[in-house]
């Protein structure tokens, strides 16, 4: 009887784990679509300074998060304020660089290079967390960079400045996502989102001082859409990281590249060329071979 109870408890735990993983996957899919819509909204308003986009996005996020925090009570009180501030700083840096990349690159290309985030996260783990950086991870990083070079070298519409901003986005996001993964152990998801928005407000205001202009007409609509989709993406991403391993969440997030390429077609990017597709394929392959080692080690 004790043995049967033990098996029953084990089955229930396994079922709950599968359900949690399924919920996490759904959250990540919604996050990927939200971020693709955010990128499309940003691309539709090229005349609005990018620091202004970050400011208005953060202002909308503060209002929406305050409404969502109603009822969270003491759970929303920050436990690690300094770590929250660092996560917010790198999140701000990554978001600003992302908007700069979107202005200079086809939408699908910018999102593809951004998805090198986990490769940079692995390198950061070696440098700052004393994690082993194996040969397969070095290979995956080189293959990924090769994919970026292929996209740039054979695509005349892709500039090195745009590629640089996209790589900066991936690097800053790697730091921010690593901190989010740690913060979700003690912080309410909305607390993490609120900290990001609150810190981004003064940073974007200072960074864009003197270059601001009043949005006109439909620019207000796209700025509002940018704020709402970024908010939904941040909330869904934070919830996904509560249920999924970072590597699994990143793998599901690759769907965002497909969303971005499809959205980019009516925005004037056209159908992706062979160079872009081949470069994207190399980047995806690099992420796959880099993840294989992590999967093998986690199963031991």
Regions found by a protein language model. Name each.
Residues 1-52, 157-182, 299-300:
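Glycine-/small-residue-enriched transmembrane alpha-helix faces in small-molecule transporters
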Residues 1-33, 62-86, 135, 185, ...:
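Membrane-interface interhelical linkers
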Residues 2-5, 254, 258-300:
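C-terminal-most transmembrane helix of multi-pass membrane proteins
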Residues 37, 73-109, 114, 150, ...:
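Specific transmembrane alpha-helical segments of multi-pass solute transporters/efflux pumps
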Residues 60-64, 113-127, 142-143, 198-203, ...:
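Alpha-helical transmembrane segments of compact multi-pass small-molecule transporters, enriched
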Residues 69-73, 100, 117-139, 258-277:
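C-terminal transmembrane-helix exit sites in multi-pass transporters
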Residues 111-116, 183-198, 234-265:
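Helix-helix packing/entry segments at the starts of transmembrane helices
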Residues 136-152, 173, 275-294:
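Hydrophobic transmembrane alpha-helices of multi-pass small-molecule transport proteins
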């Amino acid at each position: 009887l004790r043995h049967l109870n033990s098996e029953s408890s084990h089955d229930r735990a396994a079922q709950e784990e599968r359900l949690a993983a399924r919920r996490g996957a759904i959250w990540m899919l919604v996050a990927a679509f939200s971020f693709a819509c955010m990128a499309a909204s940003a691309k539709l308003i090229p005349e609005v300074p990018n620091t202004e986009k970050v400011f208005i996005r953060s202002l909308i996020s503060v209002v929406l998060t305050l409404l969502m925090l109603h009822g969270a009570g003491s759970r929303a009180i920050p436990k690690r304020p300094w770590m929250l501030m660092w996560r917010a700083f790198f999140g701000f840096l990554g978001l600003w660089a992302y908007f700069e990349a979107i202005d200079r690159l086809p939408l699908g290309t910018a999102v593809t290079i951004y998805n090198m985030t986990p490769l940079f996260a692995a390198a950061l783990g070696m440098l700052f967390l004393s994690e082993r950086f194996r040969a397969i991870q070095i290979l995956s990083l080189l293959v990924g960079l090769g994919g970026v070079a292929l996209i740039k070298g054979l695509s005349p519409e892709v500039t090195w400045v745009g590629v640089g901003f996209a790589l900066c986005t991936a690097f800053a996001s790697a730091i921010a996502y690593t901190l989010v993964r740690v913060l979700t152990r003690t912080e309410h998801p909305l607390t993490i989102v609120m900290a990001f928005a609150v810190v981004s407000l003064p940073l974007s205001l200072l960074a864009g001082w003197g270059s601001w202009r009043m949005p006109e007409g439909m620019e207000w609509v796209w700025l509002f859409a940018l704020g709402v989709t970024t908010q939904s993406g941040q909330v869904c991403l934070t919830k996904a990281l509560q249920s999924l391993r970072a590597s699994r969440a990143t793998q599901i997030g690759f769907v965002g590249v497909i969303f971005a390429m499809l959205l980019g077609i009516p925005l004037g990017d056209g159908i992706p060329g062979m160079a872009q597709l081949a470069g994207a394929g190399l980047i995806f392959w690099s992420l796959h071979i880099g993840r294989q080692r992590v999967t093998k080690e986690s199963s031991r």
